[in-house]
Regions:
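Short beta-strand segments enriched in small/hydrophobic residues
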Residues: 75-87
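Glycine-rich, charge-decorated loop segments at or immediately adjacent to ligand/cofactor-binding or catalytic sites
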Residues: 175-187
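Short beta-strand elements in bilobed, periplasmic/extracellular small-molecule ligand-binding domains
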Residues: 105-118, 190-196
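Non-transmembrane, aqueous-exposed alpha-helical and coiled segments at domain scale
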Residues: 231-581
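N-terminal secretory signal peptides that target proteins for export/translocation
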Residues: 1-18
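Short N-terminal or domain-adjacent regulatory/targeting segments
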Residues: 41-73
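A charged, well-structured terminal subsegment
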Residues: 195-226
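Bacterial N-terminal signal peptides
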Residues: 15-33
Length: 581
C-alpha cells in the first residue's frame, strides 16, 4: 500500500510545475492519511523542500535621543495635548481629570494648559507644535481608544522631543504593543504610561497615573534614551525553513507568516518561475514604505509571497502594482485601525481577461483563482512585507471577512459606460489596479429598487468619506437606457445621500475629521472636500454626506438579475499594471 501510494503520488505530479506538484502532493498526503491508517509516505521518507523566507527587512533607523527631563514641575507650564476634539469622547476623560488634579496636588505651582488638535489626529499641525515649543516646558499627549490615534500620537510626540520639548504619551493597555512598535520604528524612545483598558468608563474608578506621568517628565534619561547613531536592520536569512510540506506549513504558521490558510512553499524553483512574470529585476524596489511599518519591498519578496498565495506568474504584474498602490501611504491609519477596515482591489483593462479574472456571476465570491490569489496576496504582503501582526499593529476589534480576499475585475464587456480606469485618467486599453480602504459598512440586494433607496441607505454609513456603488450589468444598462451616464448616476447618489445638518453634526466622525477640513485643514493631502458653509447651516438643513469626488460607480456581476451594492470605500488609489509587466 505504501509503495502504491508513492507511485500514484509520483505519477499524478509528473511533468507539472513544482508549485502545482507541491499542492497536489499536499492534498494527496492529507486525503490518503484521512482515508487509511497507513501514512502516504514511510516515516522519514517524505520529500523535503527549502522554503525561502517571505519576510521583508525593516529599514535602518536613525536614533533620536529624548530631550533632557525637567528637575521639577513646580512653576512650569505643561501642555496637555488631546488628539481628539473636546466634544468627542476619547476614553481618557476621567483619567485625565484625575491626573490633572493629582499633578496640581503634587506640584502646587504647576501650570497645566489643555489644548486640542485643530487638525485630525493623523495630520501634521506645525502651528500647534511651534506653540508647544514656545510656551511649554513639557507636554502630556492624550490619544484615544484607537490604534491609529495612538500611533500618530507617538509620532507627533517624537517630533516634539526632537524640537527639544520633553513629554510622555498615555495609552491603553490593549494598545501597548502598537505604541511600542511605533516608537521602535521612529528611533525615538518616547516615554509611555499605560492606562488599564476602559479605565475611563466613568464608573468613578479611573486609574491614577499621576506618579507615572510625573516620573516620565522628571526622571533622568537612561543611556538608551540618550543614544544616537543608527540601528541597523539585519536582513532575514534567505532560507526560512527546510522540511516536509506539513513541516513548512506548521513553521510558517507558527512564525505568523500566513493568513491561516495553507500556502504553497516558496522554493527557489517556484520563485524563479514567478519572477518570469515581470521584466523587472528581482532586487528592484517596488515601494520604500510598505504599510503598516514602512518597510522597503523588493520584486523578489513580492514573488515569494505571491507563490505562497497560490498566484501564477501571469498575475505578478498585478501584484507588483498592488504593492505600489498600497505603499502610497494613504492607508496608514486604516490598516492598523480598531475599526476593522478591509481593502478592496479593482482590476481593469485587458490583463483582467488575460489572467482569467471573474467580473461576472459570483465575482465578489470564491471560485476564481486570480480573484482569490490576488486578493489573498495583499494580506500576506501586509504581514510579511509591511511588518503587520494581528494584535500588535493590526488592531481590528472584530476583524473583517474582506481581509481574506476582496478582489475582482470590472465587467467592462457588459457595461454601457466607460470603464473605471478611464474615469481615473487612463485609456481604455490600459490595465490598472485600484485599491480602496473601507469595507466596514455596506448595503446590498437592491433588487429592482431605484437609486434613491441606495442613496438613503448609504447616507447612514459611518465615516462618510467615500462610497463605491457596485451595479450589476442589468441595473447599469437599465439606467443607461433611461439616459443616465455613469457620471449622472454618481451625481444622483451624491445628491440624494443626505442627512439633516443636525444629524450630520452630531456624528463624532464629523467632529473628528470633517470640521477640521471645513476650517481649511488638510486630510491625506486634500482640502475642500465639503463646503465650508456647513459650519453655519441650521440643524434642519439637508446636506450631502459624501464628497462628490469620492462617489464611484463600478459595473460588476452576472446577467441573472438587477442588483446593486453600496460599499463604504474611500482613498481610491489607481496605478498602472502595464508598467510592471
Amino acid at each position: 500500500m505504501r509503495g502504491a501510494g508513492q507511485s500514484v503520488a509520483r505519477f499524478v505530479t509528473l511533468g507539472l510545475p513544482l508549485g502545482l506538484r507541491l499542492l497536489l502532493l499536499l492534498c494527496f498526503v492529507v486525503v490518503t492519511s484521512a482515508k487509511t491508517s497507513t501514512p502516504a509516505f514511510a516515516a522519514g521518507d517524505e520529500p523535503k523542500y527549502q522554503a525561502l523566507n517571505p519576510r521583508g527587512n525593516p529599514p535602518d533607523v536613525s536614533l533620536v535621543p529624548l530631550s533632557p527631563r525637567l528637575t521639577d514641575l513646580n512653576d512650569k507650564t505643561v501642555f496637555v495635548v488631546h488628539a481628539w476634539p473636546a466634544n468627542v469622547p476619547s476614553g481618557f476623560e476621567p483619567v485625565v481629570e484625575r491626573l490633572i488634579a493629582g499633578l496640581k496636588t503634587k506640584y502646587p505651582g504647576i501650570n497645566l494648559v489643555t489644548r486640542y488638535k485643530d487638525a485630525a489626529y493623523s495630520e501634521d499641525e506645525p502651528e500647534l507644535w511651534t506653540q508647544v515649543k514656545r510656551e511649554a516646558a513639557a507636554f502630556i499627549y492624550v490619544p484615544a481608544d484607537s490604534a491609529a490615534t495612538t500611533m500618530w500620537s507617538v509620532t507627533w510626540s517624537a517630533g516634539l522631543e526632537k524640537m527639544g520639548v520633553p513629554g510622555v504619551v498615555l495609552h491603553f493597555a490593549a494598545l501597548a504593543e502598537n505604541a511600542e512598535v511605533t516608537r521602535t520604528k521612529l528611533g525615538t524612545p518616547i516615554r509611555l504610561v499605560e492606562v488599564p483598558n476602559h479605565s475611563g468608563s466613568g464608573d468613578g474608578n479611573a486609574a491614577d497615573v499621576t506618579d507615572a506621568v510625573a516620573a516620565a517628565l522628571v526622571s533622568p534619561l537612561t543611556d538608551a534614551e540618550r543614544a544616537t547613531g543608527t540601528r541597523h536592520s539585519e536582513p532575514p536569512p534567505r532560507i526560512g525553513v527546510t522540511g516536509t510540506l506539513a513541516e513548512i506549513q506548521d513553521f510558517f504558521y507558527a512564525q505568523h507568516w500566513t493568513d491561516g490558510l495553507p500556502i504553497i512553499p516558496p522554493t527557489e524553483e517556484n520563485v524563479a518561475a514567478m519572477l518570469k512574470g515581470t521584466k523587472h529585476a528581482a532586487s528592484e524596489i517596488v515601494t520604500k514604505a510598505m504599510l503598516p511599518e514602512g518597510w522597503p519591498v523588493t520584486v523578489e519578496k513580492v514573488a515569494i509571497n505571491a507563490v505562497m498565495a497560490g498566484a501564477t506568474p501571469n498575475e505578478m504584474p498585478v501584484l507588483l502594482a498592488a504593492i505600489e498602490a498600497f505603499g502610497s501611504g494613504h492607508f496608514a491609519s486604516s490598516v492598523r485601525s480598531t475599526n476593522s477596515f478591509s481593502f478592496m482591489q479593482l482590476v481593469n483593462g485587458p490583463i483582467a481577461r488575460e489572467i482569467g479574472m471573474n467580473s461576472g456571476t459570483y465575482a465578489l465570491g470564491p471560485g476564481n483563482r486570480a480573484n482569490a490569489t490576488i486578493g489573498r496576496a495583499l494580506r500576506l504582503f501586509i504581514y510579511n512585507l509591511g511588518g503587520g501582526e494581528n494584535g500588535v499593529n493590526l488592531m481590528g476589534t472584530q476583524g473583517n471577512v474582506g481581509s481574506y480576499a476582496f478582489c475582482f475585475a470590472e465587467n467592462e464587456a457588459a457595461s454601457p459606460w466607460e470603464p473605471f480606469q478611464v474615469s481615473r485618467g487612463f485609456e481604455r486599453d490600459d490595465s490598472t489596479i485600484t485599491v480602496f480602504a473601507g469595507g466596514w459598512s455596506h448595503t446590498g440586494n437592491m433588487l429592482h429598487q431605484d437609486l434613491h433607496r441606495l442613496a438613503r441607505d448609504i447616507a447612514y454609513f459611518q465615516w462618510p468619506s467615500g462610497i463605491v456603488a457596485l451595479l450589476a450589468p442589468a441595473t447599469a444598462n437599465a439606467l443607461a437606457q433611461s439616459g443616465m451616464s455613469k457620471a449622472k448616476v454618481e451625481e444622483e447618489l451624491w445628491r440624494n445621500a443626505t442627512l439633516t445638518m443636525g444629524e450630520f453634526r452630531n456624528d463624532h466622525y464629523y467632529q473628528r475629521f470633517i470640521i477640521p477640513i471645513l476650517k481649511g485643514k488638510e486630510m491625506n493631502g486634500l482640502r475642500d472636500r465639503w463646503p465650508a458653509s456647513y459650519l453655519n447651516l441650521p440643524d434642519d438643513a439637508r446636506v450631502q454626506v459624501y464628497p462628490r469626488d469620492d462617489v464611484h460607480v463600478v459595473v460588476v456581476g452576472g446577467e441573472a438579475n438587477a442588483m446593486m451594492q453600496g460599499w463604504a470605500m474611500w482613498g481610491a488609489t489607481t496605478v498602472s499594471i502595464d508598467k510592471w509587466r
